[in-house]
């Protein structure tokens, strides 16, 4: 959203993201396993005074580079260790990404202030962007790095100034420090396919100079990454060194089977990622019309290469997660925003509005009419009867004025805010690790050792401000550990809350649909009869 005079409308953007961040902070804790893990890694680095090698539960943590952790530390240095600062990082980055999308729209379509008005609006209200703008993940950060690099590509194309390749290299280097070599998937299609998207534009450079600039930027990016990776590899040991130099490239990009999905999965998920916009048939028609009538347009071609390049490459990789495609959302916002600007809608967005209304009515009906039900329907049935009201209001808001995209955008924001307030907040106690973490901290303060059943994702380290790692052992070995540590305690898990409790627990708390329990050596006998705990989700 930008002022009609072509200036960015900071006030509206800030209010938009402040509302989202405030609702998220008030409605839910940091969620296990990912958010709590990243907080714990930052906490352990802080405790150790080691800002070179990330650590998780006492061991070097090779799954993620350190840039997000450094941003967490920067806030802690200024305001002290807190829970709230890390959770403001993504909203602040999303604000920066909104401005960068506005700036790209102004540069690609300088005569169309309406495109710069609408593209940030589409981005800010798309479901996937909203979800991760309030979550402590790496993907809004890598989206910012991609926007830095792609802004440099556009400026180099329009001005011919070689200095922009230094900025491109900065985007590459920071992207590697944010999430590894995946940044190249977001940057290289547009950089390498410039002869196609610049085919009908004036070029103030030679192609040899262009590709020389791309190579220079890549070398600079590699140098920035190696400035961290080499000393970190030397400090973290051989296993860590091998992991960051090899595991972050071949294994995580090509041989990732943890989230294996079919090649068409992203294409099928796009209407959800870009909800509510891709459920508006008239907008899709406008996009097709714009592509047909302006096929030679530099901006459209650039955004298409950016979006389709990432979509095709990530579709070909076995491991797929929704947030992998987040850096391509600004490209989609540019395409949809320009289509709305060139061919303004005159109809109401019936399909996304009816989807919201149906969701709200269905949730309220389930809460009123369904009894003792298992699974996700049981979760919905346990919500208050008014839990669907916000979705109905959001749908009616979208219909309130024909051909008015801001109403649809505000409906999208309202729907997500209501999801956090009405749905996630009642479920929050089952995802709050602080009570168990506090109990663990009490035992550690007494000098008593603590173990965890199964794979440990460090979910308690930051929440309890723990200063010692936990032993991670499966049930049979954990029983032996309790016998050999008579003053020790262990965290064990029941997969469902209704499961019978075979232990005499010192403390118990709801945990992700089941129960976490703190036991001592009296529970060792019960542990010996247990199957090994299921392995929880791995790294993404």
What residues fall within each predicted segment?
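Membrane-integral, polyisoprenol-dependent glycosyltransferases
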Residues: 1-348, 512-515
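Membrane-embedded architecture of ER/inner-membrane glycosylation machinery
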Residues: 2-3, 166, 170, 284-540
